[in-house]
UniProtKB/Swiss-Prot annotation:
Catalyzes the interconversion of L-alanine and D-alanine. May also act on other amino acids. One of its GO terms (biological process) is D-alanine biosynthetic process. The lineage of its organism: Bacteria, Pseudomonadati, Pseudomonadota, Gammaproteobacteria, Alteromonadales. It catalyses: L-alanine = D-alanine. GO terms for molecular function: alanine racemase activity; pyridoxal phosphate binding. It comes from the Bacteria. The modification N6-(pyridoxal phosphate)lysine is found at K35. Its cofactor is pyridoxal 5'-phosphate. Its EC number is 5.1.1.1. This is Alanine racemase. The active site is at K35, Y261.
Amino acid sequence: MKPFPRAEISSRALKANLKRLRQIAPGSKVMAVVKANGYGHGLLNVAEVLTDAHSNADADGFGLARLEEALEVRAGGVSARLLLLEGFFRSEDLPLLVEHDIDTVVHHVSQLDMLESVSLSKPVTVWLKIDSGMHRLGFHASEFKDVYQRLQQNPNVAKPVHLMTHFSCADEPQKDFTATQMAHFNALTQGLPGDRTLANSAGVLYWPQSQADWIRPGIALYGVSPVAGDLGSNHGLEPAMELVSQLIAVREHSAGESVGYGAYWTASRDTRLGVVAIGYGDGYPRNAPEGTPVLVNGRRVPIVGRVSMDMLTVDLGPDAADKVGDRALLWGKELPVEEVAERIGTIAYELVTKLTPRVAVCLD
């Protein structure tokens, strides 16, 4: 018996998206970003699908936020290059990086101090992060020369040191700040050895000059556009997730009757309501407004009333023939998650990563 609700993950779409991103950035290696449980698609699901060399759809490496994520990927048998995008947090983490062959970002002086205070069995591969304008992590231009020299002189650091930055506005292509960041990064790193990586998903899709040695696609890998008002399908990408549930009740509803907590919505006509087995306890946003679409039997029907913990209600219409057990699609190929996110007033990243453990993640 299939569980409901569930997130159906398409291995074919994941592979197709990786192939498409390689076409968009043919001169770059791909560091597939699988942090936050593979953007809600299942960390090992994604890593294993994209290390299938027999399918010609294997990533060159994987980007993760936390050491625990990287260790889970290694324990799952994935031998590809791994990069900790937030770097290590404690000096005790460094021997684990060596043992499991994990690259690390270095973005703060405290990490330099830890690298200089330990004795390691072999050097760690480091990606030095430059703050080119994001002002979140990374070293300023005034610090760069000294930091780079410290890394070069440290026997615990493998040579060459690799170089990276992160864009703050690449998902707003009308702004020229990304070009400013690229120029800043290139001026600081000109002539230095080592690989470079600048481009996140928006960089890959909208700023081809940023693609460099490695690209770091995250949301685009899952078939979703990083840009408001855009769809992944506009770039030849396919959504890898379909969030589905089912109708657990169909009810006759009279004009003037309300539904749900707070009697928030009142019917203006006689109709039929459907109750869908998903709610904010599953990660579907409680603040989804009236009219947010759900797909039932191939047609869009609006949410009515408040989303509750385990259920939401949709207006099926007065002539609906839908029945208990019918499939309800919350987002997917026929109902893009970008559109649902815009309707709710959030971003697709948040929707796919906030699904709770009650939602079964099922790889096809």
